[in-house]
Design a protein with these regions (language model features):
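Domain-level signal for soluble alpha/beta catalytic cores
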Residues: 4-224
Length: 224
């Protein structure tokens, strides 16, 4: 995962080291990670390989990560429904948090825990976003599960300004840090998959409380 994090306020110039991708590490360790287009992707390991998920978290901590991200990406209602796991939203989300918390405790280090408000539908597909009210309601359900459980909530891999607004709006009163992460499109510099310029997208969310902005899940050449 490629992250450029822009923190606001007093922390603005402080380097924060995060973890890396979960899916690629699971594959490297022999775990089946199906295509993100047709499945729950790396979240499948929550049903089959929880110990390896914890090992990935521990390895990132050992490598110097100051925060780790729970493996709840793709744990959304639309994606779970496609995998016949529609009634597992809360259970799988809480399981991902429990695994990460166990890793932090086992490490004995002061590590922050993050979790995702990911795209509700297939990642990078701005054309698949739901209407705003449905997005808001589904993000609110996820936000309610995460509230009080994590240090950071990341609105992650946002491909459309309204998707980002819906996700970020549901955590305005959260006690967790609020991060907003955009993804960029192919070789189109500064452009979201929706076709919006990132500055235009920022205008839609600029009045919402946000502790950090970031660019993720795109080539390093797009953000440097």
């Amino acid at each position: 995962i490629n992250l450029n994090i822009f923190r606001l306020g007093e922390e603005m110039n402080k380097l924060l080291i995060g973890d890396g991708g979960m899916g690629s590490e699971l594959r490297f360790r022999g775990v089946e990670v199906p295509s993100h287009i047709e499945s729950i992707w790396s979240a499948l390991a929550l049903t089959t390989n929880t110990q390896i998920i914890k090992e990935v978290h521990l390895d990132y901590i050992e490598a110097g990560a100051q925060y780790i991200t729970a493996n709840n990406y793709a744990v959304t209602q639309p994606i779970l429904e496609r995998a016949d796991l529609a009634n597992q939203l809360e259970d799988l989300t809480l399981l991902s948090l429990s695994i990460a918390k166990d890793a932090i405790q086992e490490s004995g280090k002061d590590i922050k825990l993050a979790a995702s408000l990911p795209p509700l539908e297939t990642s990078y597909r701005a054309d698949l976003i739901l209407d705003y009210s449905k997005m808001y309601d589904q993000y609110q359900e996820l936000a309610n599960i995460l509230e009080g459980e994590v240090d950071i909530i990341i609105c992650e891999t946002m491909a459309h300004s309204l998707e980002a607004k819906a996700a970020l709006s549901t955590i305005q009163d959260s006690t967790s840090e609020k991060w907003l992460g955009w993804t960029l499109h192919g070789n189109r510099s500064n452009t979201l998959p929706s076709g919006e310029n990132i500055i235009e997208a920022f205008e839609v969310t600029k009045d919402l409380k946000c502790d950090a902005y970031m660019i993720n899940c795109c080539g390093v050449n797009m953000v440097t």
